[in-house]
């Protein structure tokens, strides 16, 4: 099962920092997908049957409604967005509810050729530099930067040996903060100066608040087939 680390109060204080991040100019964007992790979920609250070890192929392969979609975007100034938006492939509405709220004088987006980005860019009057499916670049346009972020994120998250979906957004915020601070400050100042700044003023959080955190997504959508059988 692996070790599920405690969620420190600082992760919730980070929301204040993340809230103020805006993306401008040239942006790269792509979807990142995570499997559902139900650690810390009590047996009586399980939305699906318990999984058993088996050699049988899983019923849902690839990107399905059993995968959590995270919109990930970075601009030319290294401002980063990682936000849980729902299940399955990214849609135009998912982009509106996440990236759409973070734009400030944005000009263009490098992304795949999915219709979701085409419709999003048309509505927000942005230039879409579409990258063909299966490629990371198309001439002068690429998504190397955001793919590099995905690689760093995977390495960083693997250190925790599994993170509950309940707290995934807080860990994504933590990663964004570390990524941002590394870009802005000397590494030896990150822990001593920058971490303390976000905890000043009204960021007091009780331990009980952490355990009352709700799921960032509705698991009934992902496990509807189990609910219909009951």
Model-derived regions, located:
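Residue-level recognition of single "structural anchor" positions
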Residues: 1-230
């Amino acid at each position: 099962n692996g070790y599920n680390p405690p969620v420190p109060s600082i992760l919730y204080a980070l929301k204040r920092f993340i809230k103020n991040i805006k993306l401008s100019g040239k942006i790269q964007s792509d979807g990142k997908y995570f499997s559902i992790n139900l650690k810390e979920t009590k047996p009586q609250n399980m939305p699906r049957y318990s999984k058993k070890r088996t050699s049988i192929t899983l019923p849902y392969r690839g990107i399905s409604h059993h995968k959590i979609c995270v919109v990930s975007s970075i601009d030319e100034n290294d401002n980063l967005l990682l936000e849980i938006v729902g299940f399955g492939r990214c849609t135009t509405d998912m982009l509106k509810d996440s990236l759409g709220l973070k734009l400030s004088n944005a000009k263009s987006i490098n992304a795949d050729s999915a219709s979701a980005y085409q419709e999003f860019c048309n509505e927000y009057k942005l230039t879409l530099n579409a990258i063909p499916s299966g490629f990371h670049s198309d001439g002068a346009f690429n998504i190397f930067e955001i793919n590099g972020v995905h690689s760093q994120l995977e390495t960083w998250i693997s250190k925790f040996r599994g993170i509950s979906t309940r707290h995934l957004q807080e860990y994504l915020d933590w990663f964004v903060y570390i990524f941002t601070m590394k870009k802005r400050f000397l590494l030896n100042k990150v822990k001593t100066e920058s971490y303390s700044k976000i905890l000043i003023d009204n960021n007091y959080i009780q331990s009980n608040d952490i355990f009352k955190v709700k799921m960032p997504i509705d698991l009934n959508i992902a496990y509807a087939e189990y609910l219909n059988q009951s």
